């Protein structure tokens, strides 16, 4: 068994879609990034890569490479899942938290879980997604960005 943690943050800006866990969230702003800027998937990817000892998302999918510009983070997650399977690992479980003052994430949690389970080929009981605010504190509390944390157990 191996455990890895992941963290990601992106700035909220106008004229971008807000994608979390591969699901479009209805909101007036979206996250700025080289890819679709899906902070949840990026944190999950880093937790998986960390558990497998394979570096991090920036090493594997550098933002200096134009082939990743605008890419769906779910495609990156699928590639990471294939990498760990090739090394003989499978996901035991994933637990993640999305930190955002707005929008309200809880109505989307089940769709997010289904999206991630579909890509990772795991059952719904193997993933947990939570959402919280920072009670108006810090950059997420001021609505300037969204962050996410994740932990993954590989078996």
Curated annotation (Swiss-Prot):
Pfam name, any one: YgbB
Catalysed reaction equations from the record: 4-CDP-2-C-methyl-D-erythritol 2-phosphate = 2-C-methyl-D-erythritol 2,4-cyclic diphosphate + CMP
Cofactor dependence: a divalent metal cation
InterPro entries recorded: MECDP_synthase (IPR003526), MECDP_synthase_CS (IPR020555), MECDP_synthase_sf (IPR036571)
Lineage top rank: taxon: Bacteria
Keyword presence, Calcium: no
E.C. number: 4.6.1.12
Keywords, alphabetical: Isoprene biosynthesis, Lyase, Metal-binding
Binding, a divalent metal cation: 8, 10, 42
Molecular function as annotated in GO: 2-C-methyl-D-erythritol 2,4-cyclodiphosphate synthase activity; metal ion binding
Pathway(s) served: Isoprenoid biosynthesis; isopentenyl diphosphate biosynthesis via DXP pathway; isopentenyl diphosphate from 1-deoxy-D-xylulose 5-phosphate: step 4/6
Membrane-spanning residues: none
Gene3D superfamilies the UniProt entry points to: 2-C-methyl-D-erythritol 2,4-cyclodiphosphate synthase
Residue numbers marked as site, Transition state stabilizer: 34, 133
Amino-acid positions noted as binding 4-CDP-2-C-methyl-D-erythritol 2-phosphate in the UniProt annotation, renumbered to this chain: 8-10, 34-35, 56-58, 61-65, 132-135, 139, 142
Keyword Translocase: no
Residues forming coiled coils: none
GO BP annotations, alphabetical order: isopentenyl diphosphate biosynthetic process, methylerythritol 4-phosphate pathway; terpenoid biosynthetic process
Cofactor binding, per record: Binds 1 divalent metal cation per subunit.
Quaternary context: Homotrimer.
Function description: Involved in the biosynthesis of isopentenyl diphosphate (IPP) and dimethylallyl diphosphate (DMAPP), two major building blocks of isoprenoid compounds. Catalyzes the conversion of 4-diphosphocytidyl-2-C-methyl-D-erythritol 2-phosphate (CDP-ME2P) to 2-C-methyl-D-erythritol 2,4-cyclodiphosphate (ME-CPP) with a corresponding release of cytidine 5-monophosphate (CMP).
PANTHER family, sorted: 2-C-METHYL-D-ERYTHRITOL 2,4-CYCLODIPHOSPHATE SYNTHASE, CHLOROPLASTIC
Family: Belongs to the IspF family.
Protein name: 2-C-methyl-D-erythritol 2,4-cyclodiphosphate synthase
């Amino acid at each position: 068994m191996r455990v890895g943690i992941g963290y990601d943050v992106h700035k909220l800006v106008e004229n971008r879609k807000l994608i979390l866990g591969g699901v479009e969230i209805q909101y007036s702003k979206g996250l700025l990034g080289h890819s679709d800027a899906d902070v949840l998937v990026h944190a999950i990817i880093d937790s998986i890569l960390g558990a497998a000892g394979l570096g991090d998302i920036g090493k594997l999918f550098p933002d200096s490479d134009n082939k990743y510009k605008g890419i769906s983070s779910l495609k990156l997650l699928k590639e990471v899942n294939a990498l760990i399977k090739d090394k003989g690992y499978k996901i035991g479980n994933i637990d993640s938290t999305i930190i955002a003052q707005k929008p309200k994430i809880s109505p989307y949690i089940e769709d997010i879980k289904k999206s991630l389970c579909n890509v990772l080929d795991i059952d719904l009981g193997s993933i947990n997604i939570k959402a919280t605010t920072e009670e108006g504190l810090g950059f997420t509390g001021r609505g300037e960005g969204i962050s996410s944390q994740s932990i993954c157990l590989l078996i």
